[in-house]
Amino acid sequence: GAKHVILRYPDLYRRHQVAWGPYTNYITQDIRRIMNYRNWSKIVTNNPDGEYGHQHHKKTDELVTAVSHENAEHYDKLYYFEKFYTQDAIPEGLAKLPSDVAQKKHALIFKNYFDRGAIRMYEYFNDYENWVKATDWQ
């Protein structure tokens, strides 16, 4: 079975962000189908801030969170990506991921994400970005 699922909805078209408004119902149906496909141990998505404010990350969080609220078991398994910090604002003492987890994360990022510019721009935070249970998000 699948260890993870990454939806590939369009982000950019000819260097302009694609508006997801017309596709929201389709995206929601896909999220619902995936959540109900199997008994996932965790459901992990973008945080409500969209990490660094990306409109599609915010929308993804909104939709995944809304669908997870339809089933208490799903919501109990919902996690968000850690609060995002700029390179000069990482709090002192913010825990880094264990090295084996960080290595797996780096491999997953390079395998699944095509925006190499964004990968390079935010790479400094990869070793810190853990998951936060949705009920603990502040």
Protein language model features and the residues they cover:
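The feature marks non-catalytic terminal segments
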Residues: E73-Q138
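Active-site beta-strand->loop->alpha-helix modules in alpha/beta enzyme cores, enriched
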Residues: G1-H74
